[in-house]
Regions:
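Extracytoplasmic and endomembrane cell-envelope/extracellular-matrix remodeling and assembly machinery
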Residues: 1-137, 141-144
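Short acidic, glycine/serine/threonine-rich helix-capping segments at coil-helix boundaries
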Residues: 127-132, 140-184
Length: 188
């Protein structure tokens, strides 16, 4: 086990891990937040996020840990985070957003951090694989190109979902769930 931990630590260091910096911090979004900015491809300085009205969950200015991205792992109704370099370093080890967040949050908890302030939404639930394929096929049929329907909700699918959400007046958070699938079925 110690060899595995040392090996993983070396791997993370090689890919740019920054000591004494968080993977991310939970934030409050302003009511007028432009959800198109909730995208891991959109990076800004903490000062810029503060100008746009974002604050830490305790109401303070966003600390300067370098550029970060707004991450909404459960969509607009769940907790919001600004993720920094270490989040992306974890993703180099395992590219799943859920993995990077779980590892980051577990490390926070081991160091005495608290659980998330905003509860995970309880609602329509995640899509099964075949429903994800159906959602992608519907997006393609409606003119929102996701490429091949493979059941993986990646960047192309998220971008297409956002465009669909905008077209029907929903918050464009890019989340795929059963409610969205039902709305897409009705639109087709």
């Amino acid at each position: 086990p110690s060899d595995a931990l040392a090996s993983t630590a070396n791997y993370l260091a090689e890919f740019g891990w920054t000591n004494n910096q968080p993977w991310g911090i939970e934030v409050n979004l302003p009511e007028n937040f432009n959800y198109r900015n909730a995208d891991l491809e959109v990076k800004a300085t903490p000062a810029r996020w503060s100008e746009l009205g974002l604050k830490t969950i305790t109401g303070e200015k966003i600390p300067n840990y370098g550029e970060g991205s707004v991450f909404l792992p459960a969509g607009a109704k769940g907790p919001a985070f600004i993720v920094f370099n270490n989040f992306f370093v974890i993703k180099r080890y395992n590219n799943a957003n859920s993995y990077a967040m779980a590892v980051g949050h577990l490390s926070d908890r081991i160091l005495g951090g608290k659980s998330f302030h905003i509860e995970w939404p309880r609602g329509p639930g995640a899509l099964k694989f075949n429903e994800k394929v159906e959602l992608q096929n519907l997006l393609n049929q409606l003119g929102y190109d996701v490429g091949e329907a493979d059941g993986i909700i990646g960047p192309n699918s998220i971008a297409a979902i956002r465009k669909f959400q905008i077209s029907v007046g929903l918050i464009p958070d890019g989340m795929s769930n059963k409610d969205l699938l039902l709305k897409m079925r009705a639109s087709n």
